[in-house]
Amino acid sequence: MPAEGIPQINLDPGAAEGLRVAVISAQWNAEITDKLHAEAIGAARELGASVEDWRVAGALELPVVVAAACKNFDAVIATGCVIEGETEHFRVVCDAVTYGLTRVSLDTGVPIGNGVLTVANHQQAVDRAGGPEAKENKGADSATAAIHAALVLRQIAAVG
């Protein structure tokens, strides 16, 4: 069940027919990121998108690889999981990744689904990673949001 206030984007199966989508995921916290990765791919394919996927070492590598993918894809989904520890490294990584992904999207005009979890503990990540035990599915949610944005951009381009 989605949390209160989260928008429900309802796209019909096949709505993304003809879209090329990349899913790029960090490998840190693999128990979580493997689920996010699979859920993002599944959601994009269910919507009819053509999907390619890659893995990178960690969340800090996502922005540069996503930037490269933006040259060849209509939408890109980035997933990862950063769990707070005892140092400021958590905040540095979270801020850098969020800024980097946003900057890439603005610079390229390609929608990027930010499925990078930034959580206080492992249970919060499990609760958001998708699957039967999860409360939310941020992999699928980020894919749907990026694809929806790509479709809106196509509609805007068609008007002009």
Curated annotation (Swiss-Prot):
Q: Which InterPro entries match?
A: LS, LS/RS, LS/RS_sf
Q: Which CDD domains match?
A: Lumazine_synthase-I
One of the protein's GO biological processes = riboflavin biosynthetic process
Alphabetically ordered keywords of this record? Riboflavin biosynthesis, Transferase
Enzyme Commission no: 2.5.1.78
User: Entry's Pfam families?
Assistant: DMRL_synthase (PF00885)
Keyword check for Secreted = no
Sequence intervals crossing the membrane: none
Pathway it acts in? Cofactor biosynthesis; riboflavin biosynthesis; riboflavin from 2-hydroxy-3-oxobutyl phosphate and 5-amino-6-(D-ribitylamino)uracil: step 1/2
Reaction(s) catalysed by this chain, per the record, are: (2S)-2-hydroxy-3-oxobutyl phosphate + 5-amino-6-(D-ribitylamino)uracil = 6,7-dimethyl-8-(1-D-ribityl)lumazine + phosphate + 2 H2O + H(+)
Q: So where does (2S)-2-hydroxy-3-oxobutyl phosphate get bound? A: 86-87, 128
Q: Which residues bind 5-amino-6-(D-ribitylamino)uracil?
A: 28, 59-61, 81-83, 114
Q: Cellular component GO terms, alphabetically? A: cytosol; riboflavin synthase complex
- Active site per UniProt: 89 (proton donor)
User: Which molecular function GO terms apply here?
Assistant: 6,7-dimethyl-8-ribityllumazine synthase activity
SUPFAM superfamilies of this UniProt entry? Lumazine synthase
State the similarity comment. Belongs to the DMRL synthase family.
PANTHER family per UniProt: 6,7-DIMETHYL-8-RIBITYLLUMAZINE SYNTHASE (PTHR21058:SF0), 6,7-DIMETHYL-8-RIBITYLLUMAZINE SYNTHASE DMRL SYNTHASE LUMAZINE SYNTHASE (PTHR21058)
Function in brief: Catalyzes the formation of 6,7-dimethyl-8-ribityllumazine by condensation of 5-amino-6-(D-ribitylamino)uracil with 3,4-dihydroxy-2-butanone 4-phosphate. This is the penultimate step in the biosynthesis of riboflavin.
Protein name as it appears in the record: 6,7-dimethyl-8-ribityllumazine synthase
Which taxonomic lineage does the organism of this UniProt entry have? Bacteria, Bacillati, Actinomycetota, Actinomycetes, Mycobacteriales
Q: What gene is this protein a product of?
A: ribH
